[in-house]
Amino acid sequence: MPTNGLHQVLKIQFGLVNDTDRYLTAESFGFKVNASAPSLKRKQMWVLEPDPGEGTAVLFRSSHLGRYLSAEEDGRVACEAERPGRDCRFLVLPQPDGRWVLQSEPHGRFFGGTEDQLSCFATAITPAELWTVHLAIHPQAHLLSVSRRRYAHLCPQEDEIAADSNTPWGVDALVTLIFQNRQYCLKSCDSRYLRSDGRLVWEPEARARYTLEFKAGKLAFKDCDGHYLAPVGPAGTLRAGRNTRPGKDELFDLEESHPQVVLVAANHRYVSVRQGVNVSANQDEELDHETFLMQIDQETKKCTFYSSTGGYWTLVTHGGIQATATQVSENTMFEMEWRGRRVALKASNGRYVCMKKNGQLAAISDFVGEDEEFTLKLINRPILVLRGLDGFVCHRRGSNQLDTNRSVYDVFHLSFSDGAYQIRGRGGGFWHTGSHGSVCSDGERAEDFLFEFRERGRLAIRARSGKYLRGGASGLLRADADAPAGVALWEY
């Protein structure tokens, strides 16, 4: 299977939260560090790097500054070092409740404090030296077992999550990380939580919560008894094994979950590669052969469609479309034109893709009519987490409105009807637009929203008014943006 960016391991960025719920922050002015920020933004993001020398020490690099956290012998801390020296080496000591203690390796003292009174001079661990790890990545991803090189996916018949899939195909391969009570839950695509005995449960109970640990850039999930999740048995069932230290079997990568879509043509049939290499609209049900992985090129904003048979859609002679390309090229790129509830695709020959009378797709049209329009449905986000430029979308406390600047997120449920999406939140209320463009989450009836996939990993959401949903300085979600750009684009 060609890489071509299909399998992108996510760079793990995180925040560190102290005992007073404030985030470790790296300031540009004076390269000082403090713990004053109430939420996770750019200045609060850190990356863990292994120490270049041998041993268990690690380095903390500020994503914002690109510089390293250091602690001097007298306890003074800063984030000034452009290259990691001896004072930048820390030991991470995981505690039973899942929090971390950071110990200066050369000096043996512990790092902690409050507000701008941070130091690395403590000789004993108190609550002020305890840090919670909060992942800064988008929480919906694919989970890859490092030892088996297989992807985790929901097995509905066996009622389990198993790491036995060669490719993360379809909705079952989506895993959502839920941050709760300073720990993480693994949520399957049907909104159930993975318990440490391998069972799937509807509530995030204690045995369905895990402490995150990092080892050589990989993730491990430790349960409340100190054992680690691992694929077990021939089927690779995910459950806590016997090990109390993470080895290769207990390590996982998180990979970016690209949108997977189905397309319906004007004949009301699904576009498919079931009957060979020709891409045709000739099927009545949506299965793997009707599902395509869609990627958007960051520079051109054009998209590719990758099939379950291992080929990209590509333009061939006489305008035909076949799923045979093994590499991305100009002929595999399609320009998307959003037309309300429908989308039109323009191929590299400058012509629109249409459905011919025999159902085959071909890029032979100069204008868009009914045969050139397709319904495009996102199938691998039945539950949705949205992140904008300022943070995640989350219900505002004591209100029916939605915040767009939170470091915690709500999970919303998505349904689809005739080219439009309906979004349901906490308590079962639907999103709807109110007066002056406000977006509320307590609707009794579903309101239609249009999704436009504009950039890699980002979409625009269009309300019935024709305006786009945006974040902003007020932190409220509003439907009043004219263009699908900037604060009107959402990671999903």
Swiss-Prot record:
Q: What is its main location?
A: cytoplasm
**What GO annotations for molecular function exist for this entry?**
actin binding; actin filament binding; protein-macromolecule adaptor activity
Cellular component annotations (GO), alphabetically ordered: actin cytoskeleton; cytoplasm; stereocilium
Enumerate the transmembrane spans: none
Q: Which GO BP terms, alphabetically?
A: actin cytoskeleton organization; actin filament bundle assembly; cell migration; establishment or maintenance of cell polarity
As annotated in Swiss-Prot or TrEMBL, what is the tissue specificity of this protein?
Exclusively expressed in the eye, specifically in photoreceptor cells.
Q: Which InterPro entries match?
A: Actin-crosslinking, Fascin, Fascin-like_dom, Fascin_metazoans
Instruction: Name where it's found.
Output: Cytoplasm, Cytoskeleton; Cell projection, Stereocilium
Q: What are the UniProt keywords, alphabetically?
A: Actin-binding, Cell projection, Cytoplasm, Cytoskeleton
Q: Which CDD domains match?
A: beta-trefoil_FSCN2_rpt1 (cd23345), beta-trefoil_FSCN2_rpt2 (cd23349), beta-trefoil_FSCN2_rpt3 (cd23353)
Q: What does this protein do?
A: Acts as an actin bundling protein. May play a pivotal role in photoreceptor cell-specific events, such as disk morphogenesis.
Concerning its family, UniProt says: Belongs to the fascin family.
The name under which this protein is listed is Fascin-2
Which organism's genome codes for this protein?
Bos taurus (Bovine)
Q: Which gene encodes it?
A: FSCN2
